[in-house]
Amino acid sequence: MTTSSYFLLVTLGLLLYVCRSSFGTEHTCESDASPHPQGVCGSPLAEAVEAACELEEYLQGGTGKKRGRASPLRKRRAFLSMLKARAKRNEASPLQRSGRGIVCECCKNHCNIEELTEYCPPVTEGSG
């Protein structure tokens, strides 16, 4: 094996190791796991998602993009009410994403703003 082939093999191995170790930090939790000390649960979690979605929408710069809502304020309140009601009943199934849910990611673990915005409704083109 030549030196360049060996170097390439070692480099690919290191790259694979780095990728695997960084992607292995996804939040997972058991059903009986207790909330994280810095986790956000219940109604505050629903409010945090709403705030994160509004911030993301604001940062997109008012380019005529909307979150598919006919009446933004009414739909936002309905969405928040639904989240609060489900949080009180401890049902997060509509918020599941790839086998993990928002309760697992942000209540039983600590999540950041990027993770919160992953639960926002999709942005669609529309008129103001």
Swiss-Prot record:
Residues 1-24 form the signal peptide. GO terms for biological process: glucose metabolic process. Belongs to the insulin family. Expressed by the venom gland. Disulfide bonds join 29-104, 41-107, 53-120, 106-111. The modification 4-carboxyglutamate is found at residue 115. Keywords: Amidation, Carbohydrate metabolism, Cleavage on pair of basic residues, Disulfide bond, Gamma-carboxyglutamic acid, Glucose metabolism, Hormone, Secreted, Signal, Toxin. This is Con-Ins F1. Heterodimer of A and B chains; disulfide-linked. GO terms for cellular component: extracellular region. It comes from the Eukaryota. Pfam families: Insulin. The modification Serine amide is found at residue 127. One of its GO terms (molecular function) is hormone activity. This venom insulin facilitates prey capture by rapidly inducing hypoglycemic shock. Intraperitoneal injection of this peptide into zebrafish lowers blood glucose with the same potency than human insulin. In vivo, when applied to water, this peptide reduces overall locomotor activity of zebrafish larvae, observed as a significant decrease in the percentage of time spent swimming and movement frequency. It is found in: Secreted. Residues 59-89 form a propeptide.
